[in-house]
Regions:
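ATP-dependent carboxylate-amine ligase catalytic core
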Residues: 2-8, 22, 27-30, 41, ...
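Short internal beta-strands
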Residues: 35-43, 109-111
């Protein structure tokens, strides 16, 4: 899959911007190609992502209106949900934020188990505003399972596995790719999870 064109993101992490719950936000910040305009999280408003992730100057704001008009920064065009609430469900408190983002013309990118495109209110608002909803958990129409096809000669595949989520499988794969490219080898990262797809899909 060819990477999408770079976007200008505001990342929603309300109440969860930290190493345990914001793996999507942190992964996109550390490895993504998109410009990140702001972190939308009222619990850390006024602070900066570089307190947690040195070298990443991204202000945290309390409201979407603030994120849309930060002096010296471009207007975002996409709201990306950067944390996974318990069960991967959409918190009711976020509904207004998402609807406001749609009305402001922002695309929505989500890895939640709740598919935003199947929510009647959110889907109708997006259709009326002419904006896209991208549910990264939505399975493609045709998904090929294991077919026993062998790899091409000379190709090496490194599979990273773990016994839990958010323990670094994707980060290891991305660091291996970075090291391989630095050594002059050809290497690609094939994402299978939502965060990886947001970074490289």
């Amino acid at each position: 899959m060819e990477p999408t064109a770079p976007r200008r993101l505001v990342i929603l992490t309300e109440g969860g911007f930290g190493p345990h719950h914001a793996k999507t936000a942190w992964g996109v910040i550390r490895y993504g190609r998109d410009e990140i305009v702001a972190i939308l999280d009222s619990t850390i408003a006024g602070r900066n992502a570089n307190e947690w992730l040195p070298g990443h100057d991204i202000p945290a704001v309390a409201t979407l209106d603030e994120a849309l008009a930060i002096p010296g920064r471009p207007r975002p065009d996409t709201l990306l949900i950067g944390i996974a609430p318990t069960g991967g469900l959409l918190p009711n408190a976020w509904r207004t934020i998402l609807l406001d983002a749609i009305r402001a013309g922002l695309e929505l990118h989500s890895g939640l188990h709740t598919l935003l495109g199947d929510d009647p209110e959110i889907a109708a608002a997006a259709a009326a505003a002419g904006v896209r909803i991208v549910d990264h958990r939505r399975a493609p129409d045709r998904m090929e399972c294991a077919v026993g096809r062998r790899h091409l000669p000379g190709r090496r595949v490194i599979l990273t596995v773990g016994t839990d989520c958010a323990i670094g499988k994707m980060s290891v794969a991305l660091e291996l790719r970075r090291a391989a490219l630095a050594a002059g080898d050809r290497a690609v990262f094939v994402p299978s999870g939502q965060t990886g797809m947001m970074i490289d899909g």
